[in-house]
Curated annotation (Swiss-Prot):
GO MF annotation list: structural constituent of ribosome
Organism: Prochlorococcus marinus (strain AS9601)
UniProt feature, compositional bias: Basic and acidic residues: 97-114
Assigned keywords, A-Z: Ribonucleoprotein, Ribosomal protein
PANTHER family associated with the record: 30S RIBOSOMAL PROTEIN S16 (PTHR12919), SMALL RIBOSOMAL SUBUNIT PROTEIN BS16M (PTHR12919:SF20)
Gene name of the encoded protein: rpsP
Protein name stated in the entry: Small ribosomal subunit protein bS16
Annotated spans, Disordered: 97-121
Keyword Ribosomal protein: yes
Coiled coil region boundaries: none
Entry-linked InterPro entries: Ribosomal_bS16 (IPR000307), Ribosomal_bS16_CS (IPR020592), Ribosomal_bS16_dom_sf (IPR023803)
Pfam family, one: Ribosomal_S16
Keyword Ribosomal protein: yes
Family: Belongs to the bacterial ribosomal protein bS16 family.
């Protein structure tokens, strides 16, 4: 599978990145199939080879999350809402508490109904 991802270069603590097309199993800084652009996070400079990127995308190349956002800003991809993969522990605990409360309420309601049925008979 071909991936569109960032290849790091530059000095220590002054990183810049090239947007490259490479095999998904190759190393981060290994030899790419094709260089498609440039991104400097310090100056926010971005250069994209739009024709080559469109060609790779039509061939089925999958961009990484960071490259996807760069392509969305560059106008090559439509913005999409991606669901969060990781949910915080606090949010999970809140959901568990809410489920437990609803189960307790259901149990209380069923007890009241069963007591009412016993009193009638």
């Amino acid at each position: 599978m071909i991936k569109l991802r960032l290849k790091r270069f530059g000095k220590k603590k002054e990183a810049s990145f090239r947007i490259v097309a490479c095999n998904s199993t190759s190393r981060r800084d290994g030899r790419p199939l094709q260089e498609l652009g440039f991104y400097n996070p310090r100056t926010k400079e971005t250069r994209l080879d739009t024709e080559a990127l469109r060609t790779r995308l039509t061939q089925g190349a999958q961009p990484t999350d960071v490259v996807r956002t760069l392509l969305e800003k560059g106008g090559l991809l439509e913005k999409t809402e991606r669901p969060s993969i990781a949910i915080g522990k606090a949010k999970l605990e809140k959901e568990k508490l809410a489920k437990a409360k609803t189960k307790d309420e259901e149990n209380d309601n069923s007890k009241v109904e069963s007591e009412g049925n016993e009193a009638e008979s």
